[in-house]
C-alpha cells in the first residue's frame, strides 16, 4: 500500500522534452543495433497515439526513413483519412493509401460479423450500422454483458444483449480489420527492409486493448510505457495538429461511432489512467475514487475491472509455447 504520495493527476506529469529524447534515442538504437533495419513503417489512423509515434520516429530517424500507411475500409470514420493525411503532411513523411475493403470482403469479415449479429437480431440487414457496447459499468450488475446497437437506414436504433456465441463471433470477424492492416504494414516493411512500429499506450497495452497478431504485432512499441494522459502531453510538446489532439479517442472499428469508453475502458481515459496508476502503485481504492470523483464502491469496481482485464488478456501477451527450448544461451 502506498502511504506517501498524494494521488492526483499531477503524478502523471512528465518532462516532455526528456521523455521524447529518451524515446528517440531508444528508437535509433533499437533500429540500428537490434533490428538492423533501414527505417520504419506504421499505420496512421488520425489518432493521438499513431501521430505521436510518427513524430518521434521522424525526430529519431529523419522523415525520409518513415513511411506512413493510410488503411481505411468501408466502415471507417470520415475523419480518419483527413486526420491521417494531416499528420503525414505536417511531418513531411512519405505516405501510401491502402484501402483494405476488398480484402475484408474476400475474407468474409462483414458477412461473418452480420451473421453473428443475426443470432440476436434476426432482422439485421447489410445496410444497417452497428457497434457493440458495455453498460455503464459504475452502475451495472456485477458482471456487465455486451450489447449490440443497430441503426436502420431511417435512423431507428435497436439494442440487444449479446450471447457469448454472438459476441465472440462479432469480435472474431471484426479482428480481420486489425490483422489485415498489420499484414499490409509487414508487406511494406519487408520490401523496404524497414521495421514495423506499434503505437499502443500503457493503458491499452497493459489492459489488453489490442488484437493478437493484429495491432498488437510490431517490432518496437515506443510509447507502451506511457499512460494516455502522458501521450497527450507529449503530443502538445511535439506540436501534433490541434485537430488531432482534440479528437475523442475512438475504436473506429464499427460503422456506428463508438468511444473507447463505451467499448472497453468504462471511464474516460484520464480517469482510467489515474485508476490504473493507483492500482499499480498500491493506492487503496478509496484514494483512487477521491482523485477521480468516484465513490469508494465505484473505485473498487474499477479496480476489479482492471484486475479482470489483466487476467483475461494475459494470453494476448504470451509468446508461442514450445515443448522444449530451441535457442539456448551460449555456454
Give the role of each language-model region:
Residues 72:
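Acidic, Mg2+-coordinating phosphoryl-transfer loop and its flanking beta/alpha structural elements
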Residues 2-42, 52, 56-59, 64-67, ...:
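ATP/NTP-dependent adenylation/nucleotidyl-transfer catalytic domains that generate, transfer
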Residues 80:
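Conserved donor sugar-nucleotide recognition element shared by glycan-biosynthetic enzymes
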Residues 47:
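Conserved G/P- and acidic residue-centered "switch" motifs that form tight phosphate/ATP-binding loops
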Amino acid at each position: 500500500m502506498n502511504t506517501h504520495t498524494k494521488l492526483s493527476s499531477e503524478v502523471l506529469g512528465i518532462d516532455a522534452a526528456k521523455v521524447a529524447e529518451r524515446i528517440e534515442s531508444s528508437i535509433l538504437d533499437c533500429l540500428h543495433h537490434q533490428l538492423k533495419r533501414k527505417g520504419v513503417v506504421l499505420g496512421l489512423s488520425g489518432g493521438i497515439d499513431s501521430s505521436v509515434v510518427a513524430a518521434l520516429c521522424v525526430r529519431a530517424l529523419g522523415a525520409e526513413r518513415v513511411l506512413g500507411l493510410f488503411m481505411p475500409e468501408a466502415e471507417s470514420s470520415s475523419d480518419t483519412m483527413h486526420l491521417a493525411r494531416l499528420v503525414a503532411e505536417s511531418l513531411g513523411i512519405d505516405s501510401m493509401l491502402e484501402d483494405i475493403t476488398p480484402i475484408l470482403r474476400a475474407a468474409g469479415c462483414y458477412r461473418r460479423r452480420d451473421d453473428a449479429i443475426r443470432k440476436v437480431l434476426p432482422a439485421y440487414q447489410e445496410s444497417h450500422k452497428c457497434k457493440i457496447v458495455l453498460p455503464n459499468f459504475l452502475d451495472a450488475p456485477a458482471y456487465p454483458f455486451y450489447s449490440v446497437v443497430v441503426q436502420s437506414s431511417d435512423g431507428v436504433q435497436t439494442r440487444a444483449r449479446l450471447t457469448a456465441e454472438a459476441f465472440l463471433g462479432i469480435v472474431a470477424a471484426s479482428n480481420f480489420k486489425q490483422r489485415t492492416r498489420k499484414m499490409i504494414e509487414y508487406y511494406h516493411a519487408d520490401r523496404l527492409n524497414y521495421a514495423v512500429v506499434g503505437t499502443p499506450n500503457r493503458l491499452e497495452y497493459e489492459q489488453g486493448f489490442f488484437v493478437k497478431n493484429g495491432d498488437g504485432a510490431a517490432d518496437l512499441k515506443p510509447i507502451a510505457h506511457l499512460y494516455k494522459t502522458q501521450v497527450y502531453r507529449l503530443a502538445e510538446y511535439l506540436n501534433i495538429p490541434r485537430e488531432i489532439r482534440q479528437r475523442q479517442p475512438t475504436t473506429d472499428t464499427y460503422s456506428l461511432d463508438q468511444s473507447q469508453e463505451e467499448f472497453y475502458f468504462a471511464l474516460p481515459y484520464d480517469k482510467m489512467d489515474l485508476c490504473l496508476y493507483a492500482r499499480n502503485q498500491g493506492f487503496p481504492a478509496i484514494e483512487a475514487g477521491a482523485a477521480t470523483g468516484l465513490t469508494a464502491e465505484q473505485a473498487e469496481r474499477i479496480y476489479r475491472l482492471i484486475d479482470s482485464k489483466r487476467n483475461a488478456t494475459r494470453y494476448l501477451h504470451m509468446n508461442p509455447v514450445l515443448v522444449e527450448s530451441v535457442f539456448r544461451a551460449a555456454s
